[in-house]
Every structure is written in structure tokens, then in C-alpha cells.
């Protein structure tokens, strides 16, 4: 049976999301490099793995998946008893799982669109020889501040976003945060005490440090 393969780019936020999950589980895998600058993700053979042309794609034996958050959920369930438990303490507790699911949805729809745009403006644009649009940065930082205010309130009640243990809800945030900590946007995290503590906790995890 073939092993685990991740088809993506090591600088991609979505690819990193999957890589961190694999490292948390201490799983062996192969990262198959997809060169985004050359548009390899928009043509075969990659399109046969993800018809929407976005990294990463994933294989575990005969199983083929795409969409990073679906992949991390598969990893968390399929390898629940290996490495770090990325689910709630009682993974069969539907109420606990629903809390974690809310957190994952908030990350996907409220945090990531803003954080990824800020990373693009302040980091990735320079890679492509483009200029940062400071007006866009200001607009997106205002949006991110509102999200982080919600997080600050939540983290005053719990150590992590879904409760007292580290879960996929927290993990999904890590790659974008890693990038933003290297930009002026870092201030939005550091000026909120509990968010700042949470960021330090999740970004210092050994699995997180392996993808920086």
C-alpha cells in the first residue's frame, strides 16, 4: 500500500495546514512539490487530483482528497490514536465536537480570508514584484481586529478556542499567523493579552516550527 503523499508548495498556507497536522501525528509522508509560479496547479497531472486547481492535494494509499481542512479532519480521525489528539478529549461527544466545528468554521469564513489577504499584501506580493496596497492592509486589519476581539473574549474563558485542549480549531490558524508575525500586523496579536499567549503557545509547538 502506498504511503501518504501531499501535493503542494511548502510556502502555501493551505499546504502548511496539512503538514502541521501530519507532524502532530508523527506520520511519515512525502511532500510532492507543485510549483505555483509555473502554474503547475492549473494543469495536469495536478488537476486530476484537484479539479479546482488549488493546493494541496492528498493521497493516503488509494484514498485521494483535496481541501486542506477536509484533509486535516481525515488525518485527525483516521489516526486519532497516534501522536497528538487533534479532536476534543471525548471525540464521541457530539456537543464537544460541535464546539470545535464552530471554531473551524469561524477560522475558515471569518479569520482566514482576512489573514490570507494580509499575508498576500505584505509578503507574497513582494515575491511577485508587486507593491503592497496600504489601503487594503488598513481595511483588512480593521476586519481582523474585530475577529481577534472575539477570540480575546473566548480565550479569557478557555486556554484554546475550542476548550482546554489543542484541537484542529487552533491548528488551522497557525500557518497564516506565522506569516503575519513577520509583518506590522503582528501588533494586532500582541496588543491582546490572551490572544498573544495563545499565539505563542500554538506557534511554538514542535510541529508548527517544522513548517516555518
Curated annotation (Swiss-Prot):
Subcellular location: Cytoplasm, Cytosol; Microsome; Endoplasmic reticulum
Tissue: Expressed in the root-shoot transition zone and root tips.
GST C-terminal domain location: 93-212
Keyword hit for Metal-binding: no
SUPFAM superfamilies attached to this UniProt entry: GST C-terminal domain-like, Thioredoxin-like
InterPro entries: Glutathione-S-Trfase_C-like, Glutathione-S-Trfase_C_sf, Glutathione_S-Trfase_N, GST_C, GST_Phi_C, Thioredoxin-like_sf
Enzyme Commission code(s) on record: 2.5.1.18
Substrates-to-products reaction catalysed: RX + glutathione = an S-substituted glutathione + a halide anion + H(+)
Domain GST N-terminal: 2-83
Chain positions recorded as glutathione binding sites: 12-13, 41-42, 54-55, 67-68
One term under GO cellular component: cytosol
Subunit structure: Homodimer.
Record function comment: Binds auxin, endogenous flavonoids and the phytoalexin camalexin and may be involved in regulating the binding and transport of small bioactive natural products and defense-related compounds during plant stress. Binds a series of heterocyclic compounds, including lumichrome, harmane, norharmane and indole-3-aldehyde. In vitro, possesses glutathione S-transferase activity toward 1-chloro-2,4-dinitrobenzene (CDNB) and benzyl isothiocyanate (BITC).
Protein name per UniProt: Glutathione S-transferase F2
Species this chain originates from: Arabidopsis thaliana (Mouse-ear cress)
Gene that encodes it: GSTF2
Amino acid at each position: 500500500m502506498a504511503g501518504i503523499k501531499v501535493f503542494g508548495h511548502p510556502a502555501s498556507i493551505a499546504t502548511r495546514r496539512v503538514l502541521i497536522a501530519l507532524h502532530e501525528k508523527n506520520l511519515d509522508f512525502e511532500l510532492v512539490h507543485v510549483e505555483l509560479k509555473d502554474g503547475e496547479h492549473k494543469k495536469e497531472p495536478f488537476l486530476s487530483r484537484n479539479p479546482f486547481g488549488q493546493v494541496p492535494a492528498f493521497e493516503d494509499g488509494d484514498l485521494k482528497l483535496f481541501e486542506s481542512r477536509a484533509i486535516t479532519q481525515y488525518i485527525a480521525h483516521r489516526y486519532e490514536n497516534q501522536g497528538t489528539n487533534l479532536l476534543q478529549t471525548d471525540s464521541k461527544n457530539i456537543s464537544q465536537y460541535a464546539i470545535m466545528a464552530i471554531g473551524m468554521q469561524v477560522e475558515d469564513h471569518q479569520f482566514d480570508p482576512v489573514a490570507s489577504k494580509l499575508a498576500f499584501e505584505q509578503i507574497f506580493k513582494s515575491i511577485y514584484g508587486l507593491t503592497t496596497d496600504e489601503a487594503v492592509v488598513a481595511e483588512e486589519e480593521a476586519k481582523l481586529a474585530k475577529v481577534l476581539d472575539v477570540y480575546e473574549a473566548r480565550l479569557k474563558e478557555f486556554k484554546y478556542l475550542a476548550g482546554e485542549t489543542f484541537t484542529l480549531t487552533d491548528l488551522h490558524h497557525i500557518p497564516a499567523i506565522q506569516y503575519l508575525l513577520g509583518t506590522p500586523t503582528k501588533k494586532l496579536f500582541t496588543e491582546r493579552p490572551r490572544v498573544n499567549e495563545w499565539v505563542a503557545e500554538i506557534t511554538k509547538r514542535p510541529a508548527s516550527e517544522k513548517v516555518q
